[in-house]
From Swiss-Prot:
It comes from Enterobacteria phage P4 (Bacteriophage P4). InterPro entries: Phage_P4_Ash. The lineage of its organism: Viruses, Duplodnaviria, Heunggongvirae, Uroviricota, Caudoviricetes. This is Protein ash. It holds the Pfam family Phage_ASH. Keywords: Early protein.
């Protein structure tokens, strides 16, 4: 930035001198927390992002509200320790004189268990592994 300075010399005559002024400002802005849209608890805190330069926040008022609206949905949803899958195999019966390909389905925790249940009677080729879906009526 160019600035003009007026100074008085020793003899009292004003003198206009060009001068340079350098100004450097450093500012750091940060945002903490999860990206928007992620599931969070009802008691997770305020909606205002945690800006390093934030002056006013949503919760700057009285905070005597008791949070009791949340039901622990994630805690009550049971996750099986050994998930089950539907394994689909293209199979040929070992005893058939004229081999025909058929599709077989079996439910098991892993491919090895699924094959073990069918390998005695069939030559198997894995076609698909699908998650077991509950049927609600």
């Amino acid at each position: 930035m160019m600035v003009w300075c007026v100074v008085s010399r020793a003899d009292g005559i004003p003198c206009i001198l060009p001068a340079s002024a350098h100004y450097a400002a450093e500012s750091m802005v940060a945002q903490a927390g999860q990206p928007p849209g992620w599931p969070v608890s009802c008691e997770a805190g305020i909606l205002t992002p945690v800006w390093a330069i934030a002056i006013e926040r949503e919760n700057s008022g009285d905070s005597v509200i008791c949070y009791s609206q949340e039901a622990a949905i994630m805690a009550t949803t049971l996750t099986p320790s050994h998930p089950e899958f539907v394994f689909v195999f293209a199979a040929v019966r070992r005893a058939d004189r004229h081999p025909r390909i058929c599709m077989l389905r079996t439910v098991a925790g892993d491919e090895r268990s699924a094959r073990r249940s069918l390998v005695r009677d069939y030559v198997l080729s894995l076609a698909a592994r699908l998650p077991v879906v509950e049927v609600s009526r």
